[in-house]
């Protein structure tokens, strides 16, 4: 059985992206999401809470809850992703599950959404009370090229930095690195939290800078690179020579 080829064209929503983490009908928090540039838009991490005005927060919360009502998703954990465009919030996706940033939420507010979800499932009363209010940021690490990972280190140095909640590597030396333009490209992450947005940003950057690696291009890429260097004509500045 063969189907005729079809193309799906979707509008690109220009603007910062946010994610509302929800339990039942309560918006727990809203994060600001970071993505790599086109064409893949690989997710790079997020910050809780997002730097929003009261009106922006209220608008995103209202739109998110209206999505749940429209879809009949009033029970358990959900997360709604939106982009804030010139005409206001545009919904990107609605997910009837816990989001992937439960650790970041716990670092920011002291709320363990996994535990609270289990309480809901077994019939106990959940508790979404915020035990503290910090700025928490997660940053995912992505390699800059394909090839064989020669070495990678610095996770212990990063983890020892005050304010770093966790620093973890997913790969080991001699691992083949082939970027696919999605979540499978991640080789590690760092998570940090502090009472200050500027301080958290500085801690995360220091932790990321502490983690280093070396990747040797695959043999074919090495040959192509050498050939391109040999065949490239020398450029003579205008007016000289």
Give short role names for the model-derived ranges.
Residues 1-7, 11-50, 58-90, 95-102, ...:
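Phosphate-binding core of ATP-grasp and ATP-grasp-like enzymes
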Residues 38-42, 101-105, 160-162, 212-215:
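A short, polar/proline- and glycine-enriched secondary-structure boundary/capping micro-motif
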Residues 52, 105-109, 192-195, 199:
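Short alpha-helix boundary/capping segments
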Residues 56, 74, 105-110, 131:
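Alpha-helix N-cap/loop-to-helix boundary motif
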Residues 59-62, 112-113, 134:
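Generic recognition of short, well-ordered alpha-helical interface segments
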Residues 103-119:
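Gly/Ser/Thr-rich active-site loops/lids in small-molecule metabolic enzymes
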Residues 118-241:
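Peripheral (often C-terminal) accessory segments that flank ATP-dependent C-N-forming ligase machineries
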């Amino acid at each position: 059985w063969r189907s005729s080829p079809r193309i799906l064209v979707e509008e690109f929503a220009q603007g910062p992206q946010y994610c509302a983490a929800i339990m039942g009908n309560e918006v727990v928090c809203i994060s600001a999401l970071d993505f790599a540039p086109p064409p893949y838009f690989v997710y790079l991490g997020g910050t809780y809470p997002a730097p929003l005005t009261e009106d922006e927060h209220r608008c995103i919360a209202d739109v998110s809850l209206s999505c749940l009502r429209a879809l009949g998703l009033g029970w358990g954990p959900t997360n709604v992703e939106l982009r804030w465009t010139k005409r206001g919030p545009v919904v990107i996706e609605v997910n009837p599950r816990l989001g992937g940033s439960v650790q970041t939420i716990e670092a920011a507010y002291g709320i363990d959404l996994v535990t609270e979800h289990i309480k809901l499932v077994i019939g106990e009363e959940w508790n979404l009370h915020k035990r503290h209010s910090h700025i928490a940021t997660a940053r995912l690490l992505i390699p800059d090229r394909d090839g064989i990972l020669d070495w990678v280190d610095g996770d212990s140095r990063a983890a020892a930095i005050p304010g770093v909640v966790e620093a973890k590597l997913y790969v080991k030396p001699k691992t083949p690195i082939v970027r696919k333009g999605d979540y499978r490209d991640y080789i590690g992450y760092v998570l940090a939290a502090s009472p200050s947005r500027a301080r958290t940003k500085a801690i995360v950057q220091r932790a990321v800078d502490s983690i280093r690696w070396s990747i040797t291009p695959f043999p074919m890429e090495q040959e192509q690179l050498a050939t391109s260097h040999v065949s490239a004509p020398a450029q003579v500045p205008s007016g000289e020579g």
